[in-house]
Amino acid sequence: MTRVDTTLRLRYARYGEELRNSLHAVYGDETERVYDLVVRIINRAYRERSADLKALDEARLLQPDWLQLPERVGYVAYTDRFAGTLKGLEARVDYLSDLGVTYLHLMPLLEPRPDENDGGYAVMNYNKVRSDLGTMEDLSNLAAALRSRGIALVADLVLNHVAAEHEWAQKARAGEQHYRDYFWMFPDRTMPDKYEQHLPEIFPDFAPGNFTWDEQAKAWVWTTFNSYQWDVNWSNPNVFCEYLSIIFNLLNHGVEVIRLDAIAFIWKRLGTMCQGEEEVHHLTQALRTAIRIAAPGAAFKAEAIVGPEQLLPYLGKGEHWGKVSDLAYHNSFMVQLWSSLASRDTRLFENALRAFPAKPSNTTWGAYIRCHDDIGWAISDADAAHTGLSGPEHRRFLSQFYSGIYPGSFARGLVFQYNPVTDDRRISGSLASLAGLEIALEKGEADEIDLALRRITMLLTAVVGFSGVPLLYMGDEIGMLNDYTYADDPDHAADNRWVHRPVMDWDAADRARKDPSSPGGRIYAALQHVIGVRRSLPHMHASIESTVVPSPHQHLLILLRDHPQGRMVQVYNLSEHRTSLSAEVLRAHLGHSAWEALSGYDYNLDVHELTLEPYQALWFVAH
């Protein structure tokens, strides 16, 4: 028996039954037929996988916690806005490496429909890179260049829908029943109206409702997001097999992490919101198990921006514990950072984190402060009430504060998707503009500029210091501001999220790296330093959760990381005021002295109290 045969035999022995059971939970009597199809796809993918990628697989099998290591630091960018093309991005690998990046998420790479395309998420061809970015060969070359520098490439895969121009949709329109079965198509409004009774609207402003009449197809098509994005039917096993083949094609071109976009929506059940149904997790486990056989060095990241109780299943709950996605976004951490920054009060933050369910220890959070999307104020009424707040009133306050309407606000953001029925207002804006740098620079007041820079560096330090993989959004490391020229572009003018999707300012990046006293330089130098400190601390391993230490002062957030090699306590001042902290709080967890990792100083904790400067962060490590 050859080594290849032995490798596959051992992996099937380990994962074959799990794969079969996951498929059975969804496809029932069709399981054996589907399993045989899936095995053929797996075997073909394994044969086509390069020796270099197979070596990566073997290395990852020896270090299964590779995604949880302290040195894992993420960066998120649009290829065209960061470097023009995939080839152009190869020339920027040094920049990423110098910052400390080891995980690069490139926003939609695959060929979208030619017109309005939801920022690239209306994919027309999953097996072709956007022509303006390059080719699949360019993608492979970039992945290899990144891999040689220890940087894992992350790519999006939209699972819930395809563009109306996709080959499957075109064949469905032409009347081919095989492909009509790939979608949710109805001859009249009878079933759509029944489903609509329980479905929310994703884009109420410009895409109301969840179904669109298609004249060519002579059917009502399920279109959760936009009329040009057709929801696919995962109850059809042929759809599962199609997507598994797509995943392996990306992995065999060097992608190491697949971001499962809109994963929550892929299973439809009448009488529900059609989000997060149990079959979603069976399907994810089946996909993950399949890649464990042919490409075990790869991982899944769930794009599920939901509440805490709804989020845990995407990392694994019950029978799926630790067997679905490897990483998920900690949206609540991001929202609570912005909330506490506006209110100067961390009590709601404490309550929300304390109530957060524990994740499987082999999974990882993605922590972030900004991303390509808007900010939705995902603060539950229950968490707000527990803190003595009204949920609707607090969410309204945050929208007013970060759109600059609230008196005394330092922020400059834009309201996105106002829903008059729910009074929901989301916010667009860059980190620097929302944190006050834009207004401060306009005023030219040194004190306000200093406070804004302190806010930005504190927020970034909190993200780098939290559990999991910190995800830095392109340009935030140099304090890029809102880009209002989006309104001059007909393709972007109707979507103000483009205000925080600027073209990377490489002149500003060069200035920031050369002049650490400039505003951009202060942010870059501080972030680079914090990342370096993080890499040196075993306490930052993502298997360890950050837990709340009750703070005696509402301005301060105190987090404990209880690692086998010792304890770490992080303290963040989320206000512009000098704030005192009783040393007794620290002594209870660290003893009589501790090393502060960010400054490198030893602290005597037998004093009465410590004072934190405005927006200061302290990372204490027990001796």
Segments and roles (model prediction):
Residues 1-623:
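Active-site and adjacent substrate-binding regions of carbohydrate-active enzymes
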